[in-house]
Amino acid sequence: FRLARLFILVDVSRSMETHAQLFLRIARAFVQAANARVFVFHTRLAEVTPLLLRDSKNVQEKINAVTAGFGGGTRIATSVADFHSVHARAQLGRSSRVWVLSDGFDADEPQRLNEELGAVRGRGARISWFHPSPQRPASEAMQLALPRVSRFLRLNSLRDLAEAAEVLN
């Protein structure tokens, strides 16, 4: 039996400001308990796993420093492409789980998110999309990418996380 390799991609764009702190705390718990790798993105992708491993109360400030100057907008497809082609290329496989924590608003061309998530799925990874609103993300990019995502789950509180626990394997 082989444990699933968990990758968490956290949207830290302006539209996610009010949710990013919760998402990063949850991601940190999975780094510490499940050896997850965590990446943050808005216009670019950056791995923050080493920062989340540190015992520091200033993690949010350090992550803000890492992402400073990324610019406006959210480039989810570009970030997913960087994730699967550079950062996790050798580690993605059938036992991989990729969690995207985002509202789904993407400044890239709408069809590109479908293509990039398709590349992740093509490696055998299962994709779960966690979003902060009661309904599924409705952007054009998300509508096109629906077939690539195994499940959509609301994540706006620890209660939501507890309710999602049974499907997170």
Each PLM stretch: what is its role?
Residues 1-24:
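MIDAS-like acidic motif and immediate structural context at the N-terminus
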Residues 22-26, 112-119, 141:
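A short acidic, amphipathic alpha-helical/loop segment
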Residues 18-75:
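Metal-dependent catalytic core segments for phosphate chemistry
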Residues 8, 38-40, 100, 129-131:
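Structural beta-sheet core signal
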Residues 48, 108-111, 163-164:
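Extracytoplasmic/secreted cell-surface and envelope-processing proteins
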Residues 117-169:
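Von Willebrand factor type A / integrin I
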Residues 51, 58-96, 134-140:
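Von Willebrand factor
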